[in-house]
Amino acid sequence: MSTPALLVLADGSVFHGTSIGYEGSTSGEVVFNTSMTGYQEILTDPSYCKQIVTLTYPHIGNTGTNAEDEESRSVYAAGLIIRDLPLLHSNFRASESLHDYLVRNKTVAIADIDTRRLTTLLREKGAQGGAILTGADATIEKAQELIAAFGSMVGKDLAKEVSCTETYEWTEGEWALGKGFVTPDEQPYHVVAYDFGVKTNILRMLASRGCRLTVVPAQTSAEDVLALNPDGVFLSNGPGDPEPCTYAIKAVQKLIESGKPIFGICLGHQLISLAIGAKTLKMRFSHHGANHPVQDLDSGKVVITSQNHGFAVDADTLPANARITHKSLFDNTLQGIELTDKPVFCFQGHPEASPGPQDVGYLFDKFIGNMKAAKRA
């Protein structure tokens, strides 16, 4: 691995390093993630579509990769930036090195750069466009052309790009040491899950709590969902700007009116907010990491959460029937809401983690409780 690589940012910053993945070029929004582990889950999180991820922890790749840690069917991150790739990897579950994994998935990546300097730039100036090019003929001029062609994340409807194209069933539960992924004996709740870029651990955590899932494409109508007679509806995470997803906003409005229990995560949270008349905005400093403190305003407790979003809901635009349930202790941005007149609630972060803590896993239990109450009514 001695092929030179070049990273260029929209502000003109240039970093020279070494290619550690697929040979070629890529562009996207450059962000940083503070997670110390879980690089494979990050790479395969569809929410990172069109984003080049900088990992702030210096040594990445120590534990290799394996088939069980995939959060989707492929790598969705546009590229990877790290400080150091160890020569050796070691883990009892490892089946492949990170380098080989990146090459097989045609993911462009760069190492041997000062990620502390890069993170400081992104922290001070905010996420911005960037490009990685590999090979001796990589030039700053080519990188600038790629950055200009990419533009920004504003206005990009990426949910349609990462969503499944056909409806499928899911029953597999969470992973257990020595057992692998376990399917519960009983799954009394039927949940229709919208795939806007859903992570598999979300599906597994719902399945482990007794949910039989029907996963539907992003553009599925509310009428088609209600025809399946679900006990509840789940709105998944996903990439891009929520405002262009007018097809989803329209469907969510009708689903809310139906009175079905609804739970949304990440993009799903933003779509619920837009459906009830609130506004979203592009964050200058996006949230990406597994150590974000959030306050549960109902209990007063502080929970450590996994976060991955570049857009947020404007709390000042919420209607009267939406109450705020969670807020970020980093920047006070809105993290969760609940409707006072419908069994609908949502959370901006990732209760399923992967990677990260599961301090807010109780939100899955809340969803189960809402469905149980609805079945008794």
Curated annotation (Swiss-Prot):
Q: Give the Glutamine amidotransferase type-1 domain ranges.
A: 190-377
Q: What keywords were assigned to this record?
A: Amino-acid biosynthesis, Arginine biosynthesis, ATP-binding, Glutamine amidotransferase, Ligase, Nucleotide-binding, Pyrimidine biosynthesis
Q: Name one GO molecular function term.
A: glutaminase activity
Membrane-spanning parts: none
Q: What is this enzyme's catalytic activity, as reactions?
A: hydrogencarbonate + L-glutamine + 2 ATP + H2O = carbamoyl phosphate + L-glutamate + 2 ADP + phosphate + 2 H(+)
What is the active site of this protein? 266 (nucleophile), 350, 352
Q: Where is this region: CPSase?
A: 1-186
Q: Which residues bind L-glutamine?
A: 47, 238, 240, 267, 270, 308, 310-311
Under InterPro entries, the record lists:
Anth_synth/Amidotransfase, CarbamoylP_synth_ssu, CarbamoylP_synth_ssu_N, CarbP_synth_ssu_N_sf, Class_I_gatase-like, CPSase_GATase1, GATASE
Q: Which GO terms describe its biological process?
A: 'de novo' pyrimidine nucleobase biosynthetic process; 'de novo' UMP biosynthetic process; glutamine metabolic process; L-arginine biosynthetic process
Give the Enzyme Commission number.
6.3.5.5
Give the signal peptide as a residue range, or say none if absent.
Answer: none
Q: Which HAMAP family match?
A: CPSase_S_chain
Role summary: Small subunit of the glutamine-dependent carbamoyl phosphate synthetase (CPSase). CPSase catalyzes the formation of carbamoyl phosphate from the ammonia moiety of glutamine, carbonate, and phosphate donated by ATP, constituting the first step of 2 biosynthetic pathways, one leading to arginine and/or urea and the other to pyrimidine nucleotides. The small subunit (glutamine amidotransferase) binds and cleaves glutamine to supply the large subunit with the substrate ammonia.
- NCBIfam families the record matches: CPSaseIIsmall (TIGR01368), PRK12838.1 (NF009475)
Q: How does it assemble?
A: Composed of two chains; the small (or glutamine) chain promotes the hydrolysis of glutamine to ammonia, which is used by the large (or ammonia) chain to synthesize carbamoyl phosphate. Tetramer of heterodimers (alpha,beta)4.
Which family is this sequence assigned to?
A: Belongs to the CarA family.
Q: Which named protein is this? A: Carbamoyl phosphate synthase small chain
What species is this protein from?
A: Neisseria meningitidis serogroup B (strain ATCC BAA-335 / MC58)
Q: What is the lineage of its organism?
A: Bacteria, Pseudomonadati, Pseudomonadota, Betaproteobacteria, Neisseriales
Q: Name the gene behind this protein.
A: carA
